[in-house]
Curated annotation (Swiss-Prot):
Tissue specificity: Exclusively expressed in the AIB interneuron.
Family designation: Belongs to the G-protein coupled receptor 1 family.
Provenance organism: Caenorhabditis elegans
Region described as Disordered: 235-257, 393-431
Protein name as catalogued: Galanin-like G-protein coupled receptor npr-9
Entry keyword Cytoplasm: no
Length: 431
């Protein structure tokens, strides 16, 4: 950027704008990565617990298979997208290789599409379970669910390859310095026609939000009408021309309200997951839609700094959705809640047991060294016996000799070598 023709007042104004922008970016560069770090931590732990619990033998059904697929999509998003975006907020330039720009945006779009279409499959699964409970039993199996997920994921992956290839590192002038970021090059340089740009933005709006959400809303509407017509416990039913309550009817009728109540609980959980997703992704989709309408003029130019804050907040809200589903499962599903507690107890027991064993080995080693130091250099009738490094004892043996100290030295040296090797192997994983 040329500054020779600027007056002193213009240079002062430009310097003030630059200083204010840098100050704002520094604050954002601390706040947003911190929020993303919390999202990553909560999301990784929560979704990993969901996968572990849902893989249990007693939890194997079509709905939980879809929940596993949704958790895997969130894990992919948390591992391959959020960390790079956090660094991008903290650094003024793109510090990663160029291929990472394409990879991140490919996985970001893929995981977003996989999540929403998995939610649509969950709505279809609930619809079949409620409206056609008997007819759909052979169709709603974990195996068929995995086949449906793979079919949809293959289509999504194939369709998002061009989106990944469209992205690259865009270098631009920013007041007094050069910067770079990851963006769609044809849109960032305004080389794309308005039709091309709007096609990109609105394709995501339609196939990544409006269409799957619309299908899910229709399915839930039909499902809720069916659930509303189902009898509740204690209501009278007509059987054989006379009215019977659920208590004095046959066993199959008695069991029907309990099964209906269970279906209502599962349907309520899946519906809450869908509503949460829709609310979290709505602001970002609105920003996408407005960006398509405003192209080639950026929204920041037409709406000012307030639009920057809105775009950042909408992105943070969309990313937050990746860690909310496990919280909903824990709050609304007793089976998941009990599974989470069971897995956490198991992990805590293993960690505490491992810490106890480590402390026990250290104590045993100190005891051996103490006995060794207190033992005469040439004992006449004492043998130090060590059993696997776990305990030591002094046993009297008239047939022992001074050479019995050598195995102890060998054992201590072996322990030191083992600990050093363990330390090196552990350090090698700290990349």
């Amino acid at each position: 950027m040329e500054f020779e023709n600027l007056t002193k007042e213009e240079m002062e104004q430009l310097q003030k704008i630059y200083d204010d922008t840098i100050s704002f970016e520094r604050k954002i560069g601390i706040i947003i990565p911190t929020i993303f770090a919390v999202i990553i931590l909560v999301g990784l732990v929560g979704n990993a617990l969901v996968v572990i619990v849902a893989f249990g033998r007693q939890m194997r059904n079509s709905t939980n298979t879809l929940i596993i697929g949704l958790a895997i999509s969130d894990l992919m998003f948390l591992l391959l997208c959020v960390p790079f975006t956090a660094v991008d907020y903290a650094a003024p330039t793109w510090i990663f290789p160029e291929w990472t720009c394409s990879m991140i945006n490919f996985f970001q779009h893929t995981s977003a599409y996989c999540s929403v279409w998995t939610l649509t499959l969950m709505a279809l699964d609930r619809y079949l379970a409620v409206v056609y409970p008997v007819e759909s039993m052979t169709l709603r199996t974990p195996r068929n669910t995995v086949i449906a997920l793979c079919f949809i994921y293959i289509i999504i992956i194939a369709s998002q390859i061009p989106v990944g290839r469209m992205h690259g590192i865009y270098v631009y002038d920013f007041i007094m310095e050069k910067r770079s970021t990851c963006a769609i090059l044809t849109i960032a340089t305004a080389e794309a026609t308005p039709t091309m740009a709007r096609t990109y933005f609105m394709t995501f709006n339609v196939f990544g939000y409006v269409l799957p959400l619309g299908i899910s809303v229709v399915l839930y509407g039909l499902m809720l009408r069916k659930l509303w017509d189902m009898p509740r416990p204690g209501n009278s039913q007509s059987v054989g021309g006379r009215n019977l309550t659920n208590r004095d009817s046959g066993s199959s009728i008695r069991r029907r309200p309990e099964a209906t109540a269970a279906k209502r609980k599962v349907t309520r959980l899946v519906l809450c997951v869908l509503i949460t997703w829709a609310l979290c992704w709505l602001p970002l989709n609105v920003c996408f839609f407005m960006s398509g309408l405003a192209y080639p003029e950026p929204l920041v130019i037409s709406h000012g700094v307030i639009m920057v804050i809105v775009q950042i907040a909408s992105q943070v809200l969309a990313y937050t959705n990746s860690c909310l589903n496990p919280i909903l499962y824990a709050l609304m599903s007793q089976s998941f809640r009990e599974g989470f507690i069971r897995v956490m107890k198991m992990l805590i027991n293993k960690l505490s047991r491992g810490r106890f064993c480590t402390n026990y080995r250290r104590s045993a080693l100190r005891t051996e060294l103490t006995h060794y130091n207190q033992t005469p250099a040439h004992p006449a009738n004492t043998v130090v016996q060590v059993s696997n490094g776990e305990r030591s004892s002094l046993l009297k043996d008239n047939s022992s000799s001074a050479t019995s100290v050598q195995p102890l030295r060998t054992s201590i040296q072996a322990k030191k070598t083992k600990n050093i090797g363990r330390s090196k192997s552990t350090r090698s994983y700290n990349l």
